[in-house]
Amino acid sequence: MASAAAAEAEKGSPVVVGLLVVGNIIILLSGLSLFAETIWVTADQYRVYPLMGVSGKDDVFAGAWIAIFCGFSFFMVASFGVGAALCRRRSMVLTYLVLMLIVYIFECASCITSYTHRDYMVSNPSLITKQMLTFYSADTDQGQELTRLWDRVMIEQECCGTSGPMDWVNFTSAFRAATPEVVFPWPPLCCRRTGNFIPLNEEGCRLGHMDYLFTKGCFEHIGHAIDSYTWGISWFGFAILMWTLPVMLIAMYFYTML
């Protein structure tokens, strides 16, 4: 009996085993959370993907697809890690370390990709403004898609343009080419409306009266949407990586004791 207990102790401290079990349970639960959160991102609840797709900077969503794989993999590998720690088998611990390292590298790529492309999109409103001016009212597939997006955002968020209505006046645009300034200086959906979707005062809106015109820009909403996606992919992902690293180091130490 005593010799069996001594043999078990030689194959790894119970404290180390306990740390590995607890650490991997937290990883597997975090992996499930990451999996669920990145599915929410790919569903594009804010419906801003067209803005990112037109610019070619849609890798925030590419990072989300990688994170879906990583979240589920964290769950599976961490579950295996719990079994490896309890079984105290050298081959199982080595397999766990190799698999976790692979998932770790992929998750690093997901976090970095999402964050860098988020920074490109929201660090300066000029890119969003340029897209809006180029594609809004343009007679192309991309133009029609972005026109629908901007119409929806301006109605739902009660905003106009990227920084405000003057975006449509100060710069040339596809909208201006189709609608002279004397007819309407900004899209009619910039006008305040009643509950029945009727403009409060179309002439007052056309003349720029603040009581009848949305004066705030839509960039804050767009930036918030992209930031929300990035938080779910990058910052939560980084938090999981920071927790996983010491667990892997403990597993390496445990491997040397077996």
Swiss-Prot record:
Keyword tags: Disulfide bond, Glycoprotein, Membrane, Transmembrane, Transmembrane helix
Segments on the Extracellular side according to the record's topology features: 36-59, 113-230
InterPro entries reported in the protein's UniProt record: Tetraspanin/Peripherin, Tetraspanin_animals, Tetraspanin_EC2_sf
Glycosylated residues (UniProt): 170
Protein location: Membrane
Gene3D superfamilies hit by this protein: Tetraspanin (1.10.1450.10)
Pfam families, alphabetized: Tetraspanin (PF00335)
GO biological process: epithelial cell differentiation
Ranges that cross the membrane: 15-35, 60-86, 92-112, 231-252
Domain of life: Eukaryota
Functional note: Component of the asymmetric unit membrane (AUM); a highly specialized biomembrane elaborated by terminally differentiated urothelial cells. May play an important role in normal bladder epithelial physiology, possibly in regulating membrane permeability of superficial umbrella cells or in stabilizing the apical membrane through AUM/cytoskeletal interactions.
PANTHER family named among the record's database cross-references: TESTIS-SPECIFIC EXPRESSED PROTEIN 55 (PTHR47110), UROPLAKIN-1B (PTHR47110:SF2)
Quaternary structure note: Homodimer; disulfide-linked. Interacts with uroplakin-2 (UPK2).
Family the entry assigns: Belongs to the tetraspanin (TM4SF) family.
The name this protein goes by in its record: Uroplakin-1a
